[in-house]
């Protein structure tokens, strides 16, 4: 567990009393945060990765339909439940990290209770939307058999969503306090359950393809349950922030603050995630759509796999920036931002080289040799250099979350992706016959524009001292 040096009484700190920051020390602190967070994020990405992989390897003449069905089902789950729930929960990225930096530990527990109230309130519409996945896909013009398979797949995924929401809230609370290791272990166990159950049910029972979705639900369900023995064995990790019994009145009091940060945070995630999922819909409308969707699904999963590493850096940036601003360490927050972006650039260069160098082999981990794999190889080689801006874009958004500037990021995401990225991708794909390659080029340029806009905002308009004062005011509400 890492520590933050903050004043004994956060109400009395003075920004000018802060010691000069040490860049080398910041690198060490961020490195300690990044490792566990990156592993946890990678493991939490695996359910979708496993679902598509298991579907693609079922020995059936309908294997291609299974891949497409799993891809569409996971797409709608992402759009309607994960992006909305996780986005709203991102309010805790700001609230808890700044409260921990300010040593206002009692606030963390109340914020957590508020999160339960808010995410609990959205469960009914989330369930309603995903229950009608088949109808939605048919309305969007997708293949009828793929829509039918996707609809059942989504229904089997629903039972795990409430458990996943509860785990996500707890994860953010623990990460804000720099508690990382137990989350890695819990995520590993959850994935083991997901893989084992999905494999057995899909390959060795009459349930078949839909056993993969049941495995995902079981894997998600065990995540918060595994926190129980952890808190029993480490009660101080619970008592530090759960300082008072459940209080609906206290939870409701902070709903406004939670939504003020959570709604823009949701829009940040939704704008980006929905833009990428829009590519899935567009790929299904291309000529030879079965091959196009298969190739696109490979790119989606490879990109998500790479993105988890950047998301780990993004979470680390969010935690460190939030802790520093909450503690009034404005001079430390700025170099922390620079260091994490430099780390991101170096990692992105490594990924670019790897994706380009192995662009011919990677798609065959998902698909058998054929037109789908060949097309995926071609698109992956074109996309690989754009991984750099995609990574910088992701981590910069983490910095903005730590500073409580979700609204600005939501606006830039909307403009970059929906005014520029998606329309450009559609234009290249359909008007200039670039197909899947055009879709991904458009989104890559959208990510570049988004990063440029956020970087300009930080360089030209931010005062780190003012951000620290705003964080202090927020923790004292």
Describe the role of every protein-language-model region:
Residues 39-43, 47, 80, 84-85, ...:
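Residue-level hotspots within pore-lining transmembrane alpha-helices
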Residues 49-53, 128, 135, 169-173, ...:
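Alpha-helical transmembrane segments of multipass membrane proteins
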Residues 45-68, 137-144, 200-207, 266, ...:
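Helix-terminus/linker motif at the lipid-water interface of multi-pass membrane proteins
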Residues 32-52, 167, 190, 219-223, ...:
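Transmembrane helical elements of multi-pass membrane transporters/channels
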Residues 385-391, 398-425:
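A late C-terminal transmembrane helix in Major Facilitator Superfamily
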Residues 52, 67-127, 131, 167-176, ...:
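Small-residue-rich hydrophobic transmembrane alpha-helices
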Residues 1-37, 41, 96-163, 193-263, ...:
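Short alpha-helical transmembrane segments in multi-pass integral membrane proteins
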Residues 4-14, 28-93, 263-283:
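Signature of the first transmembrane helix
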């Amino acid at each position: 567990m890492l520590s933050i040096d903050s004043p004994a009484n956060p109400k009395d700190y003075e920004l000018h009393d802060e010691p000069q920051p040490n860049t080398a020390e910041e690198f060490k602190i961020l490195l300690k945060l990044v490792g566990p967070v990156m592993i946890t994020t990678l493991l939490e990405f695996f359910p979708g990765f496993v679902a598509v992989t298991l579907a693609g390897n079922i020995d059936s003449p309908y294997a291609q339909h299974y891949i497409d069905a799993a891809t569409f089902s996971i797409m709608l789950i992402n759009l309607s439940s994960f992006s909305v729930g996780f986005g709203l929960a991102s309010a805790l990225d700001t609230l808890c990290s700044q409260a921990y930096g300010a040593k206002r530990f009692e606030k963390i527990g109340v914020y957590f209770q508020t999160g339960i109230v808010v995410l609990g309130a959205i469960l009914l519409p989330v369930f309603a939307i995903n229950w009608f996945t088949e109808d939605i896909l048919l309305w969007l013009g997708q293949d009828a058999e793929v829509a039918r398979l996707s609809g059942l797949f989504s229904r089997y995924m629903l039972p795990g969503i409430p458990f996943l929401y509860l785990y996500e809230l707890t994860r953010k609370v623990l990460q804000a306090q720099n508690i990382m290791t137990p989350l890695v272990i819990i995520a590993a166990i959850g994935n083991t359950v997901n893989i084992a159950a999905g494999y057995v049910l899909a390959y060795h029972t009459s349930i078949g393809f839909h056993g993969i979705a049941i495995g995902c639900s079981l894997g998600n369900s065990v995540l918060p349950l595994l926190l129980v023995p952890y808190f029993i064995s480490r009660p101080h990790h619970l008592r530090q922030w759960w300082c008072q019994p459940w209080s609906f009145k206290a939870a409701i009091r902070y709903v406004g603050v939670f939504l003020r940060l959570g709604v823009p945070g949701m829009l940040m995630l939704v704008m980006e995630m929905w833009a990428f999922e829009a590519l899935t819909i567009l790929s299904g409308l291309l000529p030879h759509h079965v091959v196009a969707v298969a190739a696109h699904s490979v790119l989606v999963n490879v990109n998500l796999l790479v993105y988890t590493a950047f998301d780990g850096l993004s979470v680390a940036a969010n935690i460190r920036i939030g802790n520093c601003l909450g503690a009034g360490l404005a001079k430390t927050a700025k170099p922390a931002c620079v260091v994490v972006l430099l780390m991101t650039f170096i990692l992105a260069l490594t990924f670019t080289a790897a994706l380009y160098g192995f662009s011919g082999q990677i798609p065959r981990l998902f698909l058998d040799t054929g037109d789908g794999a060949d097309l995926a190889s071609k698109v992956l080689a074109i996309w690989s250099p754009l991984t750099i801006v995609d990574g910088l874009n992701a981590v910069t958004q983490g910095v903005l979350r730590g500073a409580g500037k979700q609204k600005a990021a939501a606006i830039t995401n909307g403009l970059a992706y929906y005014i520029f990225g998606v329309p450009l991708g559609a234009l290249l794909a359909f008007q200039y016959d670039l197909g899947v390659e055009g879709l991904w080029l458009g989104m890559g340029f959208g990510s570049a524009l988004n990063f440029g806009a956020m970087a300009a905002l930080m360089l030209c308009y931010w005062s780190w001292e003012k951000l620290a004062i705003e964080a202090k005011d927020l923790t004292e509400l």
